[in-house]
């Protein structure tokens, strides 16, 4: 949100600013309040439960924010996996920096999305959600490496 052009795009898209609780407790608390309002209004809320961009291309442990959100607002959670991001401008492949070479894979590089069935909030843990997202990633990986049998 601090970068002028990206910040404007984030605000236009309705993104919610988030900061680690230790870094900025006020922004941290406001993020959960804003998330609750989005859900109370009947809108969709997309989050990145890892809490940051991967530095090695692998799915990182999911943090507790998702648990806090569904504890306050018990809505179904739709597991979504973003595919083929590693090596794109959205990864930290260039010495830990994101957006280092935006056109590395060309002007029209492809990324994908895989979606699983909604999971009920009751009893859902960050670990269970992470397992489902990892399953989506594994299926995608297998589909790219296996050859169809005639």
Predicted regions and their residues:
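Hydrophobic/aromatic ligand-binding patch that stacks against planar heteroaromatic rings
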Residues: 9, 37, 68-72
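Catalytic-site beta-strand/loop segments enriched in glycine and acidic/polar residues
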Residues: 36-67
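TIR-domain catalytic/interaction hotspot
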Residues: 28-37
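A cross-family acyltransferase "interaction/gating" segment
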Residues: 55-124
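A conditional alpha-helix N-cap/helix-loop micro-motif detector
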Residues: 24-29, 59, 126
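Catalytic core of membrane glycerolipid acyltransferases/transacylases, capturing the structured
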Residues: 1-25
């Amino acid at each position: 949100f601090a970068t002028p052009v990206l910040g404007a795009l984030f605000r236009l898209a309705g993104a919610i600013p988030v900061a680690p609780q230790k870094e900025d407790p006020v922004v941290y608390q406001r993020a959960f309040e804003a998330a609750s309002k989005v859900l109370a209004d009947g809108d969709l809320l997309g989050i990145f439960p890892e809490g940051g961009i991967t530095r090695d291309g692998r799915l990182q442990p999911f943090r507790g924010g998702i648990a806090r959100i569904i504890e306050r607002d018990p809505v179904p959670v739709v597991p979504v996996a973003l595919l083929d991001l590693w090596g794109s401008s959205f990864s930290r492949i260039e010495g830990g920096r994101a957006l280092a070479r935006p056109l590395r894979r060309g002007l029209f590089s492809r990324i994908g999305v895989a979606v699983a069935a909604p999971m009920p909030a009751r009893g859902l843990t960050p670990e269970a959600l992470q397992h489902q997202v990892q399953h989506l990633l594994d299926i995608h990986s297998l589909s790219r490496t296996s050859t169809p049998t005639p």
